[in-house]
Amino acid sequence: MSFLLLILVFIPLINFISIWFLEILWGKRVAIWIIAHSYIIIVILGLIGLNKVSSGVFKFFTLGSWIKCGIFVVNWGFIFDTLSVSMLLMVGIVSGAVHYYSIGYMESDPSLIRFISYLSLFTFFMFILVTGDNFVQLFLGWEGIGLCSYLLISFWNTRVQANKSALKALVVNRVGDFGFLCGLVLVFYFFRSVDFSIVFVLSSFFTKVKS
């Protein structure tokens, strides 16, 4: 079941990469049709996963370590529980609806493929944000969302207002980045770990000691 949910997480990334090749092979209409209908698969997998984890069973999936520096170790891992899978399902439904609406609204736009690819990448980083099992991976998802927000807002880059709005969003996100990084440093300073499972256990222990 964890493997199916892991596939769900990476479907938008596959869409982001493959849509360009699909357009070359079969044309824009077929490429967009395939990408849009992939969200039906995402919703189905999300419903199956939610049914499996609704009993309160936590599922962890670790692909390996990607940062090792002394005691600072960050794993490329995912946690699938009721909360994260519910968020996966909700994001998948909303993103699918946005994809379908965008395809209809921008049907005549020559850059529709590029817009859909940005949407797919945005969805992928949303999935990373809600399923990551540590604060660094959460930060990666947050940064990716900020980048994709800028790309989507400035999509029509010939419009002055679109560029201004994109720049404003980028600046505001950087303020959030600073607060996020400060919190991340403090978490590692006090708990010597950035893994959610370790931090949550130790934080509850500190609370009991304090009381």
What are these regions (language model features)?
Residues 1-211:
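...captures the hydrophobic TM-helix bundle architecture rather than a specific catalytic motif
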